[in-house]
Amino acid sequence: MNLGLSVAALAGVALAIAAASVAPARRGNGENLMIGNPACGKNPGNAGHGTPLVTTGKNQLAIFAQGCFWGVEERLRKVPGVIATAVGYAGGQAANPSYEEVSRGSTGHAEAVLVEFDPAKVSYAQLLRFFWETHDPTSGNAQGPDRGTQYRSAIFTFGAEQQKEAAASREEAQKGLRDPITTEIAPAGPFWIAEAYHQQWDERHGSLSCPLPHRARRN
């Protein structure tokens, strides 16, 4: 399956998608995952999108934050039924944040992965199980050696049904863990696509850069 990102396209295009127009969902290209917002950011390679984020056709969206987004994205791209991915920044206050700003912890954003998936091939519940099993949701603002609010565990949901499923899955996951889960569950706000050099980092560099998964202590 080819989920390659056109880095040059993401870096060189200033995004301004009309709210009424739907771009086709090209594999691996975060530019075309969603309906844009007229007020979306226009910095090349750091293009912001406002809510709502909407896919074309029957596909659905999910946003997961579970530490350094390089390794998280690489693992998600290997899940059958995942159509496209983009790494970016979610859950913060500032508009159009840069990686440097997010890394300083000054914007409130978490490093996150936006996923487009085909629910006929992989359910949201299955993606949630993958989420709980591939990081430590009890470690607060950290994953392994990475420290800071940008590395916190979070699920950003689209609609009441995802919110309900995410909350139920958190309760179920807690039953098997010794320490309390710190994962934030919140409605998806603006998702800001990260700079082009972050997209599909591990795939382009031929290695798994982030030391994931980190396992929580089990009962």
Question: Can you name each region flagged by the protein language model?
Answer:
Residues 2-219:
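Flexible coil/turn and secondary-structure edge motifs
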